[in-house]
């Protein structure tokens, strides 16, 4: 799990002068950081797996739906474990269409995609299932992502990213070797974004403790 899944990666968009976009970073990872020789179709699927643009291939369109399905169900499970929501709070209209459990929701959406896309040259969902999925996503925004408790945690996480960003901006020689060697070609701020964006939430938290907290407090 890296920062685009866990910590508020949009903070980097505020910090980095050229802006930071998750899908563009995903493409940079395979093109630059990993130096992979991928096909145009694969790269198109990566850069269009999020956002409003549609991938050019059926495979890429499937990935985009799969990402949305996994995202909303994963976050519901996490929110329930954290005590932020309960099953009874999920919108009845969504439950009636998608089901009551994570397994049933995933099965409904995947089956609907298969049925709705059969014999077509585009991957799609039926209107009712698509609406239920987006209504569920909106519910998560209203009750989890923007809720006070989650927002407070996001503020804390954002502060960690800022501290790390500015620290390494002033101490580039402390970057791992695989990032230091990129400084001259890509520039300090770009490389620091690469480093932070690849961190897991646990790694970022531990790095913050290592750099800023006395050993007895970390």
Model-flagged regions — what are they?
Residues 10-16:
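Active-/binding-site microenvironments in catalytic and ligand-binding cores
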Residues 1, 16, 50:
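Acidic, glycine-rich active-site loops and adjacent beta-strand->loop/helix elements
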Residues 20-218:
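Histidine-centered, transition-metal-coordinating active-site segments
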Residues 2-7:
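Short, small-residue-biased leader/transition segments that mark boundaries at the very start
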